[in-house]
Amino acid sequence: MLHTWIRTLGALLLLASVAHAQFQFFEHMFGGGRQEHQQQAAQNEPSDSSRYQNMWESAQCDKYLCPGTLACVHFPHHCPCAHPDNEDKIELSEGSAVCISKGGFQPGEAARKIELARKGVL
């Protein structure tokens, strides 16, 4: 009887230690709980626009300062796209242009879709 009780107790201790090790593994794997989430949140930039306003005010430009990229150009439609690898610049009319997502389209496809929309076909 004592032998059975000792075996049962040993099995329970083994099971408890395996379960504890398993939970420690998952806790470590997923960032260690709340402390990691607090650390990650501290890395985010605030949603305050003062940083952008400071950059705008300190920019040196005697022509036109593009609001999206802070590039200094002669005319507003000369402003570059903020993400040229992912956007195509399309001139809509004299003096106006937009940057539109390429969205995985073939080269020139975004401009064609804008033209179709302008004609009322799309």
From Swiss-Prot:
Keywords per UniProt: Signal
UniProt entry tagged with the keyword Signal: yes
InterPro entries named among the record's database cross-references: LCL2
Thylakoid is among the record's keywords: no
Signal sequence region: 1-21
UniProt GO BP: ERAD pathway
Superkingdom, natural source: Eukaryota
Similarity comment: Belongs to the LCL2 family.
Function: Probable component of the endoplasmic reticulum-associated degradation (ERAD) pathway.
Name of the protein: Long chronological lifespan protein 2
